[in-house]
């Protein structure tokens, strides 16, 4: 459905990433226009404008449609329809600007699929993980941004200071307590994810709860008072008994499941006698570069690595393809 003028210019005019490598969910092409979030009159005017666009999320899934080329794209609707669906500011989010076009999002919840009701014929809802392989990179980044903010908002309806109700302000990017006036902002949890290497081999581990045969890079949350390098070294030692001797940065990835920033690293370790802790890790395996490439290609029977949407896949590939 082409509900209103939809520039979709990012298909032709992409913002250049600051890093030469860009992970899935990174590269949001919208101008977040954070300076406009406090201007309630401007937001109301844009929300009512025929030129503004709206996107819809329902239980964390995004409304999408077929593009003219046969692929998938966000199903943008008139922003006034999105406002009507929202029932008020509690479920609305100002996403930003594409040139001078304002983009809003609405967060719907409940068991009834809106495409069986008010959104019938306007597209279908798809999970963000599934869309990572079918949406253009800029659009999946927009979906990830909306999903991450809405996940945070759902979990912070009560003030962490006094327990009273909070309400959204600044276009949905802040919540204020109605009682003590405490301010709450979207949460992002930093996670270090590292590929351990020794000589010409890398180490991958697996957890019992993962799909059978899946091996991946090790990861863990950054703790207060730690640097990225210190967190990397701690996680490697705690989970596998390995000591890091050097750490180099690869890239980062916003991960909206629910609110993480994955910090991708490659860590040299002092040996290959890994000892999985049997709590976080149940097994580890070492791979040469050729074996790692085969693992990524699905050529090792009974074993596989995370798919290309995951930063773990990109860490393995970057190391495996080094000269």
State where each predicted segment sits:
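Generic recognition of flexible, low-complexity loop/linker segments
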Residues: 251-253, 296
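Solvent-exposed residues in well-ordered beta-strands and their adjoining turns
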Residues: 268-270, 287-288
């Amino acid at each position: 459905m082409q509900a209103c003028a939809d520039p979709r210019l990012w298909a032709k005019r992409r913002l250049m990433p600051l890093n030469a490598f860009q992970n899935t969910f990174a590269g949001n092409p919208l101008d977040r226009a954070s300076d406009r979030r406090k201007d309630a009159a401007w937001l109301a005017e844009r929300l009512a404008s025929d030129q503004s666009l709206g996107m819809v999320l329902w239980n964390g899934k995004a409304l999408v449609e077929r593009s003219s080329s046969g692929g998938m794209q966000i199903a943008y609707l008139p922003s006034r329809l999105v406002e009507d669906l929202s029932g008020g500011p509690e479920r609305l989010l100002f996403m930003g600007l594409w040139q001078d076009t304002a983009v809003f999002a609405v967060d719907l919840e409940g068991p009834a699929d809106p495409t069986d009701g008010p959104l019938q014929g306007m597209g279908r809802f798809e999970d963000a993980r599934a869309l990572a392989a079918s949406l253009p990179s800029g659009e999946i980044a927009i979906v990830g941004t909306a999903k991450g903010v809405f996940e945070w908002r759902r979990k912070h309806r009560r003030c962490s200071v006094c327990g009273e109700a909070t309400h959204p302000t600044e276009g949905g990017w802040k919540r204020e307590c109605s009682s003590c006036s405490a301010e709450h902002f979207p949460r992002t949890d930093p996670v270090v994810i590292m590929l351990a290497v020794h000589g010409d081999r890398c180490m991958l581990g697996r957890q019992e709860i993962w799909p059978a045969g899946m091996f991946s890079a090790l990861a863990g949350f950054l703790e207060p008072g730690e640097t990225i390098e210190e967190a990397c070294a701690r996680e490697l030692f705690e989970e596998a008994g390995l000591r890091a001797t050097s750490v180099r940065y690869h890239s980062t990835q916003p991960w909206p499941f629910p609110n993480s920033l994955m910090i991708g690293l490659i860590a040299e370790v002092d040996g290959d006698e890994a000892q999985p802790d049997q709590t976080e890790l149940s097994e580890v395996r070492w791979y040469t570069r050729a074996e790692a490439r085969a693992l990524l290609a699905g050529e090792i029977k009974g074993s596989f690595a995370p798919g290309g949407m995951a930063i773990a896949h990109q860490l393995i590939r970057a190391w495996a393809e080094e000269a």
